[in-house]
Amino acid sequence: METATIFSIFFSCLLIGLTGYSLYTSFGNASSELRDPFEEHED
């Protein structure tokens, strides 16, 4: 395989993994532990 092909596959997998992790953190089970700074400082 060429170096560019390996790099593009690696970069694509990395991007998909980070997107999946961020979606899981935002909407998954861990989202109940996130704090909302706007809700804490209501005036």
Swiss-Prot record:
Keyword set includes Thylakoid: yes
GO biological process, one term: photosynthesis
Subcellular location: Plastid, Chloroplast thylakoid membrane
Recorded coiled-coil stretches: none
Tree of life domain: Eukaryota
Transmembrane segments: 5-27
Family per similarity comment: Belongs to the PsbN family.
Protein name according to UniProt: Protein PsbN
Species for this entry: Mesostigma viride
Lineage: Eukaryota, Viridiplantae, Streptophyta, Mesostigmatophyceae, Mesostigmatales
Protein encoded by which gene: psbN
